[in-house]
């Protein structure tokens, strides 16, 4: 009789606000506000590691992890709760966030904190894949989760004695637990059976929004790969799986060769970097740092392992600004020997009077400009020498909102996710990332709200959400509270505090001084970029002698050199700045294919037009209005021969003038406000990978279609009301079709002119004057109302306007010279009723369109810093 197998421990399913996670026994489950928690509860009453769930002595228990606001059962605060099926507990207060438990019935995959192990690359001479064995478990370092009693210890009814586990403060990472002397390790949970296909979605263990790195169980090699090759990527069929939003599904391959281990990039979108340089293939040597997305892996002794954030050379993953000086024009110093250290979890405010270089420092730290002296390092990398590999780790939120106001929060973030995430991410992946980002920012309830209907603080959160899509670990904000009232100011600063508490380095440039107490440190700059103070906000009063900011700013502004001297006297002389490394090429931002970007921008542009109801109604009515105006021309012959002695001797010419001016006005009005209206948005998207070419082509195509539709409406109205051309077509088969082409191409060329004017404009206030000048000048240069042929310089100036060639093409189509002979019609060779004249007019319209688009492409190009 076969022996019965012991029953497997029951799994635990945790439900919170509609989300569901399932965990297997054997590992503590962390519930808290921290982004790295297994069950994240984004609530101000919840501690970073609030609650521990553990399977012990045949049952699941919930343990209060020394939280400030406690664990509640039946309205009573308790230290420990025995969990049973269908039980509910509250955390934070008796009416706080509710957790519902289900024990033993869920069949999906089980999430858990990962264990640690190294992956040793197989020896090429072996020629075979190594046999699977039990994963090696890394040792626990001090100050980490090992302080909790082991899982085999019975949980007492009273609060557990001794120190309880907490997430480390500062720069320590939640997992893997590590000590300063331990070799770098790679994360991999124990092998588990794959879940059913239908159960995968609800139990995903990784937090894509914060780019937590977990290496999952090894899979089998597929495809034709050399013996011993190791595949790296986001998909579960890789040997090393990185659930990192910037990693491609099959990102890179490690291949043993006679010369050593080689890493080969699999044409990934965001690239593979070795020691900060992007490579297609490279031989690895001990100590080489391989960067994939936001993850650093170290190659040592034939082993690929994650780089430890707490090693000395990596500066605990923080930001180090050392002796940074920036001088322009040879002798004008904007930043003067600034030094600053910010660890993960720290919120740093940069303040100072106008002209102190606050925004300049932010741009320099973000890598947009490089220092004259000194260095900026982040997570062990020189920002300016290795910028290409760090670009995705740095999120920059400019002062202007970078979210389209006409879109809902969901649509804005989904389009941004399409542009920023690798092309092999599915819609479900992007939806999950967006949902988690909004949850972190407490914006989930506003997901279907139009951005322009949000409050100022909520709009700033939406701008921050765009940056969090790719999981940056350094977030820089320039004047996020500008123009906000005190209540919204507090909301924004509280949000920044929470973002820092999640383990990021947050640097905020601000003029608002009311809520600096939420910051960990304050950097006060004097004019000329000189440091006047750097330290906790509680020390400002004792050090500066007053807490009156007006007096402080006045003092440092009156004598910046003295302010810096007093600072150095307090802190001691700063060490000499390290030598400046040669700035590397910025490299092209990682971007998806042109077609994918084109598709995304085109779909977004259409939604923007339709969502702006007032603008959309105006565009829809405009062709009907212009068509009706054309009907106001007196006479009843249309494009026939008018009576020279009648009331309308130039009826055909007047109809063409109104058609031509209507086409010019429709096209220019269609696009003139487009580029200036989203310039800040485009600049940020361009910096993170949006192709200027794809962006411009998408807009050209969308507006071309709209211009053609508008032209069709106008032309049909005129043809119905006045009749079609009577002299036959000169180039196309039908004169009515040819007249439509005349109007449509003129409208399209005018739309391209509108884009050019929008690229030139400095502000939205300049749009209306530019539109008026453009339309009125082309009314003159068309030649239909005021003769320009042979008149210097009107004739020459008219050659660069669409109206000149649009009117000439339509005049050639209807044979205006024949219909209205004599002094009313100038002898213009471009109006002749011949195919050569018509094709020349069309060619000029197309050429002008290309010139306008080329100018716009040059104007909005990505400029090197």
From Swiss-Prot:
Q: What is its EC number?
A: 7.-.-.-
Alphabetized SUPFAM superfamilies for the sequence: P-loop containing nucleoside triphosphate hydrolases, SMAD/FHA domain
All copies of domain ABC transmembrane type-2, residue ranges: 596-810
One example GO MF annotation = ATP hydrolysis activity
Q: Where, if anywhere, are coiled coils annotated?
A: none
Q: What Pfam families does its record include?
A: ABC2_membrane, ABC_tran, FHA
Q: Name one GO cellular component term.
A: plasma membrane
Its function, per the record, reads: Involved in the translocation of an unknown substrate across the membrane. Transmembrane domains (TMD) form a pore in the membrane and the ATP-binding domain (NBD) is responsible for energy generation. Required for virulence.
- Please list the residue ranges that the record marks as compositionally biased, kind Low complexity: 135-156
How activity is regulated?
Function is positively regulated by phosphorylation.
Q: What happens when the gene is disrupted?
A: Disruption results in a growth defect in macrophage and mouse infections.
Listed under subunit, the entry gives: Homodimer. Interacts with PknF.
The cross-references to PANTHER family, in alphabetical order and at most eight, read: ABC TRANSPORTER G FAMILY MEMBER 28, PROTEIN SCARLET
Q: What is known of its domains?
A: In Rv1747 the ATP-binding domain (NBD) and the transmembrane domain (TMD) are fused. The two FHA domains are required for phosphorylation by PknF.
Outcome recorded upon mutating residue 210 to A: Lack of phosphorylation. Attenuates growth in macrophages and in mice
Top EC class per UniProt?
Answer: translocase
**GO terms for biological process?**
transmembrane transport
Quick one: where's region Disordered? 104-205
Q: Which UniProt keywords are listed?
A: ATP-binding, Cell membrane, Membrane, Nucleotide-binding, Phosphoprotein, Repeat, Translocase, Transmembrane, Transmembrane helix, Transport
Q: Which residues are involved in binding ATP?
A: 352-359
Give the similarity note: In the central section; belongs to the ABC transporter superfamily. In the C-terminal section; belongs to the ABC-2 integral membrane protein family.
Give the species: Mycobacterium tuberculosis (strain ATCC 25618 / H37Rv)
Which segments constitute the FHA domain? 29-78, 230-279
- Report what the protein is called: ABC transporter ATP-binding/permease protein Rv1747
């Amino acid at each position: 009789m076969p022996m019965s197998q012991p029953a497997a421990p029951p799994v635990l399913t945790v439900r919170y606000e509609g989300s569901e996670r399932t965990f297997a026994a054997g590992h503590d489950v962390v519930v808290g506000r921290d982004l790295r928690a297994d069950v994240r509860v984004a609530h101000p009453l919840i501690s970073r590691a609030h609650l521990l769930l553990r399977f012990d002595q045949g049952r699941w228990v919930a343990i209060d992890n020394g939280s400030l606001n406690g664990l509640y059962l039946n309205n009573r605060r308790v230290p420990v709760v025995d969990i049973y099926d269908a039980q509910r507990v509250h955390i934070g207060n008796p009416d706080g966030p509710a957790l519902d438990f289900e024990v033993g019935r869920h069949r999906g995959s089980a999430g858990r904190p990962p264990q640690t192990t190294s992956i040793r690359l197989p020896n090429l001479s072996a020629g075979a894949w190594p046999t699977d064995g039990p994963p090696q478990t890394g040792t626990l370092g001090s100050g980490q989760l090992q302080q909790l009693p082991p899982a085999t210890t019975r949980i007492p009814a009273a609060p557990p004695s001794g120190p309880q586990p907490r997430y480390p403060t500062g720069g320590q990472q939640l997992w893997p637990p590590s000590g300063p002397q331990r070799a770098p390790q790679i994360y991999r949970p124990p092998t588990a059976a794959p879940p059913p296909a239908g159960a995968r979605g609800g139990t995903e263990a990784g937090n894509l929004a914060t780019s937590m790195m977990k290496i999952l169980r090894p899979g089998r090699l597929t495809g034709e790969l050399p013996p011993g090759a190791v595949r790296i990527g986001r998909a579960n069929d890789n040997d090393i799986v990185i659930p990192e939003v910037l990693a491609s599904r099959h990102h890179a391959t490690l291949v043993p060769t006679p010369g050593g281990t080689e890493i080969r990039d699999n044409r990934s979108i965001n690239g593979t970097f070795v020691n900060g340089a992007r490579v297609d293939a490279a031989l690895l040597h001990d100590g080489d740092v391989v960067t994939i997305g936001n993850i650093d892996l170290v190659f040592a002794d034939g082993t690929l392992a994650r780089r430890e954030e707490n090693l000395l050379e990596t500066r605990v993953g923080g930001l180090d600004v050392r002796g940074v000086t920036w001088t322009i024009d040879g002798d004008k110093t904007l930043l003067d020997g600034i030094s600053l250290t910010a660890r993960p979890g720290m919120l740093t405010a940069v303040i100072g009077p106008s002209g102190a270089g606050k925004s300049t420092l932010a741009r320099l730290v973000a890598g947009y400009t490089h220092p004259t002296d000194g260095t900026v390092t982040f997570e062990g990398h020189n920002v300016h020498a290795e910028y290409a590999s760090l670009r995705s780790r740095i999120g920059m939120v400019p002062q202007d909102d970078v979210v389209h106001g006409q879109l809902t929060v969901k649509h804005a973030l989904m389009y941004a996710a399409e542009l920023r995430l690798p092309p092999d991410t599915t819609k479900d992946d992007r939806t999950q990332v967006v949902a988690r980002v909004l949850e972190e920012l407490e914006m989930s309830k506003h997901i279907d709200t139009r951005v322009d209907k949000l409050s100022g603080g909520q709009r700033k959160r939406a701008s921050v959400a765009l940056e969090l899509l790719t999981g940056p670990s350094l977030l820089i904000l320039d004047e996020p509270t500008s123009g906000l009232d005190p209540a919204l100011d507090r909301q924004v600063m509280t949000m920044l505090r929470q973002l820092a508490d999640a383990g990021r380095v947050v640097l905020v440039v601000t003029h608002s001084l009311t809520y600096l107490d939420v910051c960990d440190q304050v950097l006060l700059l004097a004019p000329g970029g000189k440091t006047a103070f750097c330290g906790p906000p509680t020390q400002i009063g004792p050090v500066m002698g007053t807490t009156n900011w007006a007096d402080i700013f006045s003092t440092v502004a009156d004598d910046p050199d003295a302010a810096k001297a007093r600072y150095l006297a307090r802190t001691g002389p700063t060490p000499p700045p390290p030598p400046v490394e040669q700035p590397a090429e910025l490299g092209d931002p990682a971007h998806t294919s042109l077609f994918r970007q084109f598709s995304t921008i085109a779909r977004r542009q259409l939604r923007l037009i339709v969502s702006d109801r007032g603008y959309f109604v105006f565009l829809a009515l405009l062709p009907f209005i212009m068509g009706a105006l054309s009907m106001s021309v007196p006479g009843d012959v249309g494009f026939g021969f008018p009576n020279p002695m009648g009331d309308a001797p130039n009826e055909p010419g007047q109809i063409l003038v109104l058609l031509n001016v209507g086409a010019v006005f429709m096209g220019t009005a269609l696009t003139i406000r487009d580029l200036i209206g989203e310039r800040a948005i485009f600049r940020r998207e361009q910096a993170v990978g949006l192709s200027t070419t794809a962006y411009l082509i998408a807009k050209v195509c969308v507006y071309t279609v709209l211009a053609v539709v508008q032209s069709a409406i106008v032309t049909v109205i005129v043809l119905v009301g006045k009749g079609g051309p009577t002299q036959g077509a000169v180039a196309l088969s039908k004169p009515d079709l040819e007249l439509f082409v005349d109007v449509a191409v003129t409208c399209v060329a005018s739309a391209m002119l509108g884009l050019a004017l929008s690229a030139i404009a400095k502000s939205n206030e300049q749009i209306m004057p530019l539109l008026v000048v453009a339309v009125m000048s082309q009314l003159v240069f068309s030649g239909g109302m005021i003769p320009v042929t042979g008149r210097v310089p009107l004739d020459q100036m008219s050659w660069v306007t669409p109206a000149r060639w649009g009117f000439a093409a339509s005049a050639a189509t209807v044979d205006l010279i024949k219909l209205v002979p004599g002094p009313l019609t100038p002898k213009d060779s471009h109006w002749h009723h011949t195919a050569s004249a018509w094709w020349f007019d069309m060619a000029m319209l197309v050429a002008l369109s290309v010139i306008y688009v080329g100018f716009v492409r040059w104007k909005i190009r990505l400029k090197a810093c």
